[in-house]
Amino acid sequence: MRQKLEEIKNSAINELKASLSKDQLEVIRVKYLGKKGELTQILRGMGALSQEERPIVGKVANEVRSYIEETIKEAFSDIKNKEKSIRLENETIDITMPGKKQEVGKRHPLDLTLESMKDIFISMGFTIEEGPEVELDKYNFEALNIPKNHPARGEQDTFYINDNLVLRTQTSPIQIRTMENQKPPIKMIAPGKVYRSDSVDATHSPIFYQMEGLVVDKGITFSDLKGTLELFAKRMFGDKVKTKFRPHHFPFTEPSAEMDATCFVCNGEGCKVCKGSGWIELLGCGMVHPQVLRNCNIDPEVYSGFAFGFGVDRMVMMKYGIDDIRLLYESDMRFLNQF
C-alpha cells in the first residue's frame, strides 16, 4: 500500500510539472483528489487494513494528499503569475504616444450676451436684482396695472399653476418687489428666465431670457430714459449704431415707446432680416405709470421713473446673426463651437 502511495505521488508530480494551464491542473486534481480519484479510493479502502497497518498507511496517505494539494496550489499560482506577465506585456503602454486631449467647453452665446449686458449696466451704476420664477398673480399682473379681465392679459399666454400662482411671463415682478423693499433712489436691472405658452418655432420658445431695468428717483424724465438706452446700444453694438423711438402702449408705463436700432446685418441699408426697413425692434420702454408707483407705496407726485425690457434671446440672435431661436437650446456642439 505504501508503495502504491509513492507511485501516485510521483505520477502526480510528473504530470504537474508537464501542465501548462489551469485547465490541465484541474484535470490532475480531479484525477488524484476528486471523489473518484486514485488517492481518494485508497483512503476509502483503508478499512480493509489491519489495525497495525492502518495508522501507518493513513499517515503516509495524508502526507501524500497534502503534498499533492500544496503542489497543485503552487502550480496554480505560477501559471497565474505567468498569465499576468503575458497580459501586462501585451498591454504595455507606449508613453511616447500623444495623449487624448480633453475637450474644452465654451461659454454659451446666451451667457456671453447676458454678461456683456450686465457689465454695461453695472458700469452705469445699476444693481442686479433677482426674484422667483414661480410668481404671484399680484406681482406678475395686478401691481403692474394689469387687473383681472384687463385686455393686456390676453396678449400673454400664461402658464397658470393655480388661480394665484403663475410661471412669470416677464421679469417685471422683480421691479415691483424691489420698489416694495427699497426706497428711492432705485437703479436696477432684472435678468432671468421667463415663460409663455408659445408654440416652438424659429422665433418663439416657451422659455426664454429677458432683462428689464428700472430707475426711480426725483426728477427722472424721458430724456434720461433715451440717454441711458442710447448709451447702452452704442456700448453693446458699437458707436455707429443709430436708434429711434416709436410711440407704443404698455399698461405699466405712460408714455410708452419701442426703441429700434439700425439693422446689424445690413447696417441700415435694408435686408431680409429687417424686412427692407433698415431697422430692428430692440426693446420696449416708457415712464413708470403713476399707478404702478402707488401700488408700491411710492408717491408719484414726488418720484418718477422709467423702465425698459429686452428679450435677451433676440439680442443674441441679432448680435450673432442667428435666424432660429431653437439653436440656442438644442445643445448642438457644431453650433456652440462657433462662439
UniProtKB/Swiss-Prot annotation:
Record-listed E.C. numbers: 6.1.1.20
The molecular function terms in GO held by this entry are: ATP binding; catalytic activity, acting on a protein; magnesium ion binding; phenylalanine-tRNA ligase activity; transferase activity; tRNA binding
Any idea which positions bind Mg(2+)? 254
Q: Which UniProt keywords apply?
A: Aminoacyl-tRNA synthetase, ATP-binding, Cytoplasm, Ligase, Magnesium, Metal-binding, Nucleotide-binding, Protein biosynthesis
| NCBIfam families assigned to the protein according to its UniProt record, in alphabetical order | pheS (TIGR00468)
Output the GO biological process annotations, alphabetical, semicolon-separated. phenylalanyl-tRNA aminoacylation
The name this protein goes by in its record: Phenylalanine--tRNA ligase alpha subunit
Q: Give the cofactor note.
A: Binds 2 magnesium ions per tetramer.
* Binding partners and assembly: Tetramer of two alpha and two beta subunits.
